[in-house]
Each structure stands twice: as C-alpha cells, then as structure tokens.
Amino acid sequence: MADNLSQSFDKSAMTEEERRHIKKEIRKQIVVFALMIFLTLMSFMAVATDVIPRSFAIPFIFILAVIQFALQLFFFMHMKDKDHGWANAFMISGIFITVPTIAALMLLLGVNKI
C-alpha cells in the first residue's frame, strides 16, 4: 500500500456535466452569500444613518431578516434540493406554530403599544 503513494491518482469518476453542475452551484452560493452580506449591510446602514423612519425601522430590518433566513435555508441548508420532504414539513409546521405564538405573546404582554 505504501508503494502506491508515489503514483498519481486516477481522474475522478465525475462526468463533465456533473463538474459543470458543481461549478454552477458554487457560483450560486457565492452570489447568494454576497446578497446576504449586502442585506446585512443594508440593515446596519438603515439604522446607523437614520435613512429609514423610526416607525418603519424594525419592520424593515425584520423583512430583511426573513429574506436572509429564507436564502440561508434554501441555498446553504439545501432545502431546495429534493428528498427534504420531512425537513420542509417540520420547518413549515414550526413556522405555523411560532407565528401565532409570538403574536399571542405580543398581545398578551402589550408589546404592540409602540
């Protein structure tokens, strides 16, 4: 086994189409990563420069956070790929449980009095 270390390895078993697909996927992930950095900078700049009115700042940042969360789920957690039916079902059911719970807590605690 140690004698074979000086020999070069065989080419990968990937086809040219698979290599193109992987390169395309890497490009997509880089673009999405840059978009998420842009969204983060946009939320920081919106607060730091007072461009957004105070009454709209929190909803604006929340909207950007939801967009960023969706991008992370679909591109970096690979939820857009097939065979993730159970994971998608759990995520959707979690959202349907979380949103009414947060809304009820806001009403109960009186947080909506801004």
Swiss-Prot record:
Its EC number is 7.1.1.9. GO terms for molecular function: cytochrome bo3 ubiquinol oxidase activity; cytochrome-c oxidase activity. GO terms for cellular component: cytochrome o ubiquinol oxidase complex; plasma membrane. This is Cytochrome c oxidase subunit 4B. It is found in: Cell membrane. It catalyses: 4 Fe(II)-[cytochrome c] + O2 + 8 H(+)(in) = 4 Fe(III)-[cytochrome c] + 2 H2O + 4 H(+)(out). The chain crosses the membrane at residues 29-49, 56-76, 89-109. GO terms for biological process: aerobic electron transport chain; electron transport coupled proton transport. Keywords: Cell membrane, Membrane, Translocase, Transmembrane, Transmembrane helix. Belongs to the cytochrome c oxidase bacterial subunit 4 family. It is a multi-pass membrane protein. InterPro entries: Cyt_c_oxidase_su4_prok, Cytochrome_c_oxidase_bac_sub4.
